[in-house]
């Protein structure tokens, strides 16, 4: 549904028209309505539309609006007709004009809206092919341009951001481009026409958009029925995770203990997923509950401005995708995150010991070289393959006594 000359339907207070004057052929003119081209006009128009759309949604009508374009979503053909009629009457009652030529008022299951294709049969939102082709071409051109400017990189980033509703993984593959742009602006005193040097990671992101983004065009808008729950919490001493009815925890290494709490919280989510995800989780949505709002934001936004946190977030999403899982994070007050909090503070320090590496190396050289460490953790294992006594991020197996050793000679 499209509004005709939408801005011009909004009158300007008589005393304020003098601020909207312009000169044309020696004559002085002033706007008596909201003009196009005014930088504040989109925000003003959006605020004017708020109570109107509020009225529509108060009737249980689901709608999506961007400035003067609106889509109405209804559960059936008949309901769609009723909802559309109510929206039209509401808009007309406050003085707006419907652009009948550009509006699609007949109920349909497939429609183009704001450069996207909404398909209620497959329940997906996809990018129009022409927009997808433009993104691929611009990404490829920028990647291979020997003297690309900061402005050119910024324009590509803008194109990428505009695809977020349709290409879900786009959020995961543009952060290093943004980092390169920001660093280049700092080095060149905000001169957008200066040359922009890209890191290898940024080039890899452009390569992804040039060659692979089309594979992920189409985001599902269907609610997932299969859900698995993970709760996570971190303290300065360790981490704790629950997954469904399973528990695990661990201590931080000396290096990890020096990290910021936001890093620890996000790392806890990664360690928990590494400990529990398996092929049986495929097709599920992993709902993560955490009492750290930064960790929640990074997971849901597929990254952020801090490089170290962005790297962990990338690992989280790559891990979930490798098991055909999706992930959503939710904030939970610390007082309600009881089990994970307790696990993050409860540690058996006496279990985290090992032979001195030099001693172990001497024994391995003079007697035998084991290929499996049977009682170890991610902090004290001595060989590449190890068995932990509880779920562990990198363990080959859990509980050495429960492993079936059918061929002792094979280790």
Model-predicted segments: where are they?
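Polymerase palm active-site segment centered on the conserved acidic dipeptide of motif C
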Residues: 62-64, 72-141, 154, 221, ...
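Active-site palm subdomain of RNA-directed nucleic acid polymerases
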Residues: 42-90, 272-290
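Conserved catalytic palm subdomain of right-hand nucleotidyl-transferase polymerases, strongest
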Residues: 1-12, 152-155, 230-232
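C-terminal reverse transcriptase regions that engage the nucleic-acid substrate
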Residues: 105-221, 334
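Reverse-transcriptase-like RNA-dependent polymerase core
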Residues: 4-29, 45-55, 121, 126-130, ...
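Conserved pre-motif C helix in the palm subdomain of viral-like polymerases
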Residues: 7, 28-60, 148-172, 273
């Amino acid at each position: 549904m499209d509004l005709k000359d939408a801005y011009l339907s909004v009158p300007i207070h008589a005393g304020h028209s003098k601020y909207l004057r312009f000169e044309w052929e020696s004559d002085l003119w002033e706007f008596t309505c909201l003009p196009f081209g005014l930088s504040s006009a989109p925000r003003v128009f959006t605020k004017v539309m708020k109570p109107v759309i509020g009225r529509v949604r108060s009737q249980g009508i689901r709608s999506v609006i961007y400035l003067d374009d609106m889509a109405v979503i209804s559960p059936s053909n008949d309901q769609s007709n009723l909802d559309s009629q109510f929206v039209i009457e509401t808009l007309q009652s406050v003085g707006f004009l419907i652009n009948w030529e550009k509006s699609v008022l007949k109920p349909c299951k497939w429609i183009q809206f704001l450069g996207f294709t909404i398909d209620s049969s497959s329940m997906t939102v996809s990018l129009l092919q022409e927009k997808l082709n433009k993104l691929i071409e611009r990404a490829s051109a920028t990647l291979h341009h020997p003297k690309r400017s900061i402005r050119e990189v910024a324009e590509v980033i803008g194109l990428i951001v505009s695809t977020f509703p349709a290409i879900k993984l786009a959020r995961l593959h543009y952060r290093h481009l943004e980092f390169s742009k920001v660093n280049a602006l700092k080095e060149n005193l905000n001169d957008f026409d200066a040359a922009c040097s890209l890191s290898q990671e940024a080039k890899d992101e452009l390569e992804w958009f040039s060659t692979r983004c089309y594979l992920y065009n189409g985001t599902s808008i269907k609610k997932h029925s299969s859900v698995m729950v993970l709760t996570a919490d971190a303290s300065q001493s360790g981490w704790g995770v629950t997954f469904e009815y399973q528990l695990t925890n661990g201590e931080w290494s000396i290096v990890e203990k020096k990290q910021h709490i936001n890093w620890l919280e996000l790392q806890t989510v990664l360690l928990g997923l590494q400990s529990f995800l398996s092929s049986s989780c495929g097709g599920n949505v992993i709902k993560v509950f955490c009492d750290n709002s930064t960790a929640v934001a990074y997971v849901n936004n597929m990254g952020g401005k801090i490089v170290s946190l962005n790297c962990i977030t990338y690992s989280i999403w790559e891990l979930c995708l490798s098991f055909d899982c999706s992930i959503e994070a939710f904030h939970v007050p610390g007082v309600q995150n009881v089990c994970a909090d307790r696990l993050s503070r409860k540690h058996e320090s006496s279990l985290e010991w090992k032979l001195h590496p030099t001693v172990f190396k001497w024994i391995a050289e003079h007697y035998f070289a084991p290929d499996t460490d049977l009682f170890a953790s991610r902090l004290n294992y001595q060989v590449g393959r190890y068995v932990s006594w509880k779920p562990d991020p990198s363990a080959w197996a859990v509980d050495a006594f429960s492993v079936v050793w059918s061929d002792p000679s094979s280790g």
